[in-house]
C-alpha cells in the first residue's frame, strides 16, 4: 500500500494569490479610515488629555513619552490612542470642505450596516471592499508563518495551508464556530467548514457576480447573520467559498487556467503528469535532510488526519476498499524474505501499541506527538539502535527472530 501523499487538485497557490493582491494589500495598509463616530472618539481623547494635563509633566515630555511608547510598542492602549489622535489631527488640517467630508464619512458608516464586514478584526482598519479585506488580513497571517508552514499562534502547531490553519483554529474557539469572511457562512463543525453557504449574503451588491451561488439546502439552516468569531485573532476564509473563488478567478487568471486544464485533461496526459510529479517528489525526498524529512512526515500526517476527519462515509468506504486492494496486490507479489520481515514489523507494531495503551492518556498523547520519544520506545523494545536503513533493519529483525527461536527451543 502506497503511503505517498496525493496531490490536492483544490489547493490554492497562495504565492500567486499574494502576487495578484499585493497592490490592493498595499493600498489597504495605507488607508486611514476608522469606522465609528469621530466626534465620540475626539471627546474620549480630550478626556484623556485632561487627565494627563493634571499631572506635573509638561506637554513636551508627554509627546516624547508617547513617541517612545509608539516606537517600542510596549503599551497597546497608548499606541491605539495616539494612532487615533493622529488620524483626528489629519482630519483637522485646514483643507477646504473637510468638515463636510467628515460628516459624509460618518453618515455613510452609520447608514450601511454591511460596511462593518470590511473592517479588519485585528487592527480595526476599514478596507473599503472585500478584496482589500482579504489581502489585508492575510498580511497579519503571513507574519506568523514560515516559508513552508502556517503556525498556530495558540499552540504553535505547523500547518501546511491557510485552510488547514482555519480548521485547526476552530479547536481553540470556545463555541467551535466561525464565519467565512467573504460569504459570511457559519461553520459549526469541521465537516461543514468548506460546504455551507448563505444565499442572502452571496446576493449582496458588493458581489453581484455571485448571485444564487449558495446551495438551496442552506435555506433551512441557521442563517441568522451574527458577528463572526475569530479564534486566536485570525480571520478565517473558506477555501471552497463561491464568492472567494470568484475573487480569485477575477484576479489570478493562472488559477482559472490551471483548474480548467486539470478538469479537461485526458487520461493519458493525467497519468504522465502524475508520473512526472512522483519522479520530482522522489528526487526532492532523496536530497532532503533528516530534519526536513521529519518535518515533512509530520506535516503529511497532520494533513492526512484532517482530510480523513472531513471525508464522508462513502468516501471512507471507497478509501478503505482501495487500501485493501493495494495491500492484497502488494502481498501477492512479495518474496518470502519480505513477507517474514513484514510479519516481524507488524508484531513489533502491535507490541508498541499495547504498551502505549497501558500508559497514561496525557503521556500517550505526548508520545504520539514526539517522534523521538516513539523512536526511543521502539529502540528499547527492539533491542537495537534506531534509525537504521531498510536492509540493516531487515537483517537485524531476521537475526532477532532466529535468536528468539533458539532461546525458545533451548527452554523446551
Curated annotation (Swiss-Prot):
SMART domains: ZnF_C2H2. GO terms for cellular component: nucleus. Residues 26-83, 278-319 are annotated as: Disordered. It comes from the Eukaryota. GO terms for biological process: regulation of transcription by RNA polymerase II. It is found in: Nucleus. Residues 257-366 form a coiled coil. A zinc finger (C2H2-type) spans 116-140, 150-172. Keywords: Coiled coil, DNA-binding, Metal-binding, Nucleus, Repeat, Transcription, Transcription regulation, Zinc, Zinc-finger. One of its GO terms (molecular function) is DNA-binding transcription factor activity. Its main location: nucleus. InterPro entries: Znf_C2H2_sf, Znf_C2H2_type. Residues 58-67 have a biased composition (Acidic residues). May be involved in transcriptional regulation. Belongs to the krueppel C2H2-type zinc-finger protein family. This is Zinc finger protein 821.
